[in-house]
Amino acid sequence: MKNYILLLLVAVCFSCKNENTSIDTSSVEGHKTKLTANDIVNKSIEVSGGEKFKQSSLKFEFRDVYYQALRKNHEFLLVRILVKDNDSIFDMLSNVGFERYDNKDFVKLEDSIAKTYEASVNSVHYFSVLPYGLNDEAVNKTLLADEQIKGKDYYKVKVTFNENGGGEDFEDVFVYWFDKQSFKLDYLAYSYNEASGIGMRFREAYNERYVNGLRFVDYNNYKTKSTGFVLENLGKEFENNQLELLSKIELEHVEVQLINN
């Protein structure tokens, strides 16, 4: 596994290229024909960077922690680097599984702990490149009724996951709001299991920027003020000021290199 990771990282150094391009979404128009959930997600991925995600090396910081992601064809390597004093902890999730290293030394973990770390690493990387990832095999998409938020019309898509391939948190449920004109992802909500029951979050995208042709956003992260909310209705609850700002999800120092085939 260690040699596999080193080979991938070395390959990136020799095969990356910079392309200072941006995505032109001005020609995207609304469609009179009925679009499916897959159609909407595909168009959203396209205006967010499309196939470039599949051949990319990303670096960013989130809450003073370093993250790196390498995607090349059907191979991937997702890394979290925790730095303290002179020590560095590397959490690595790839096609072959999860591993942790303390500097250069492999750390053997109990399965339950390893799964917790794996889910944590995967979650940050998952949100960082949305809507990319919504066409994974374990994803199930359902088109809900259109909705208007703050005067803009949105397609609304619900996402669930198969247990097989859906990860540790396969029972989580997501709802995504895509602008009907640009197909960009502006809002999302999700439910998750916690000790006290079902938790919910709603996120509002802001600070859109394209880095080497890939779209990145930050999020205002909201929680419900009380119990009894319905996940699919959080867009309206947000518009009616029924949600409370909990935190901000900000990706800093984002770098993108595109990889040659």
Predicted regions and their residues:
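C-terminal motif of bacterial Sec signal peptides marking the signal peptidase cleavage site
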Residues: 12-15
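Positively charged n-region of N-terminal signal peptides that target proteins for export
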Residues: 1-4, 17-18
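Short, hydrophobic/aromatic-rich segments at coil-to-beta transitions
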Residues: 53-59, 73-80, 150-158, 185-187, ...
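Flexible, processing/modification-adjacent segments and terminal tails
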Residues: 100-168, 195-196, 250, 260
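Intrinsically disordered terminal and processing segments
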Residues: 34, 38, 47, 51, ...
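Gly/Pro-enriched, hydrophobic low-complexity segments
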Residues: 155-254
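Solvent-exposed N-terminal domain segments of exported/luminal and surface proteins
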Residues: 50-93
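N-terminal leader/targeting segments and the immediate start of mature chains
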Residues: 17-62
